[in-house]
From Swiss-Prot:
UniProt-listed GO biological process terms: protein quality control for misfolded or incompletely synthesized proteins; rescue of stalled ribosome
Record flagged with keyword Secreted: no
Family recorded in the similarity comment: Belongs to the PTH family.
Record: residues binding tRNA: Y16, F67, N69, N115
Annotated coiled-coil segments of the chain: none
PANTHER family in the cross-refs: PEPTIDYL-TRNA HYDROLASE (PTHR17224:SF1)
PROSITE patterns associated with the record: PEPT_TRNA_HYDROL_1, PEPT_TRNA_HYDROL_2
Species of provenance: Salmonella choleraesuis (strain SC-B67)
Assembly and interaction partners: Monomer.
GO cellular component: cytoplasm
InterPro entries (alphabetical): Pept_tRNA_hydro, Pept_tRNA_hydro_CS, Pept_tRNA_hydro_sf
Site residues by UniProt (Stabilizes the basic form of H active site to accept a proton): D94
Gene this protein is translated from: pth
The protein's Enzyme Commission number: 3.1.1.29
Listed name of the protein: Peptidyl-tRNA hydrolase
Length: 194
């Protein structure tokens, strides 16, 4: 099944743009830049969107302009308009359980406490069977510090690692369309930024 929608999760506004919680949007921004497909605000989809072509496949890019916990509103609008199935969606999000410099593809699973994923699963009729790109941001070491951590900006050294992992994830996304998910996954899962 080909991917028809790639979503980068984020909170809107300049005050959140550089926070860890916006790592998913950084990936979609990079894809849009690499493929020369600038994102434009599209109110009916509650987000910034663009259209790219990968190996002859039409793919929509989406960065919701809703707050993170309402991400499903944007995804739901696009899915119903373009008749996209859950397994044709790739959602990029920040991942506490992976260190900076690591990114991994995954199909299905729970939301792991991520409010963006939680809302998307709910708006897809409680169907969690969409693809995810988990962008490692690390963990503060104390669950009580998670909110401040994800809404904080990574130090320069961590930002560099996250950026390198996102860069590799973008290359592996293109590889996915060329040579399949297994090959793309194998390459991405052996990558660790230094």
């Amino acid at each position: 099944m080909a991917i028809k929608l790639i979503v980068g999760l984020a909170n809107p506004g300049t005050e959140y743009a550089a926070t860890r919680h916006n790592a998913g949007a950084w990936y979609v921004d990079l894809l849009a830049e690499r493929l020369r497909a600038p994102l434009r605000e599209e109110p009916k989809f509650f987000g910034y969107t663009s259209r790219i072509t990968l190996e002859g496949e039409d793919v929509r890019l989406l960065v919701p302009t809703t707050f993170m916990n309402l991400s499903g509103k944007a995804v739901g609008a696009m899915v119903s308009f373009y008749r996209i199935q859950p397994d044709e969606i790739l959602v990029a999000h920040d991942e506490l359980d992976l260190p900076p410099g690591v990114a991994k593809f995954k199909l299905g699973g729970g939301h792991g406490g991520h409010n963006g994923l939680k809302d998307i699963i709910s708006k897809l009729g409680n169907n969690p069977n969409f693809h995810r790109l988990r962008v490692g941001i690390g963990h503060p070491g104390d669950k009580n510090k998670v909110v401040g951590f994800v809404l904080g900006k990574p130090p320069v050294s961590e930002q560099k690692l996250i950026d390198e992992a996102i860069d590799e994830a973008a290359r592996c996304t293109e590889l996915w369309f060329k040579e399949g998910l297994a090959k793309a996954t194998s390459r991405l899962h052996t990558f660790k930024a230094q």
